[in-house]
Amino acid sequence: MKLTCVLIAAMLLLAVCQLDSADATETGCKKDGSWCWIPSECCIESCLITCWY
C-alpha cells in the first residue's frame, strides 16, 4: 500500500517538476534526477510528506 502511494507521488512530482522545470532547476530540485525526493523548497513536497507520514 505504501509502495503504491510512493509510486503515485513520484509520478505526480515528476510531472510537476517537468511543468515547473525552471523553478526546479533554480532550487536544484532536479539536479541529480532526484525528482524532489530530498525535502526542499521545490515542486510539491506535500505529496511525499503525506506518503511517508
UniProtKB/Swiss-Prot annotation:
Belongs to the conotoxin O1 superfamily. The cysteine framework is VI/VII (C-C-CC-C-C). Probable neurotoxin. It comes from the Eukaryota. Disulfide bonds join 29-43, 36-47, 42-51. Its main location: secreted. Residues 1-24 form the signal peptide. It is found in: Secreted. Expressed by the venom duct. GO terms for cellular component: extracellular region. The keyword Iron-sulfur does not apply. GO terms for molecular function: toxin activity. This is Conotoxin Cal6.27. Keywords: Disulfide bond, Knottin, Neurotoxin, Secreted, Signal, Toxin.
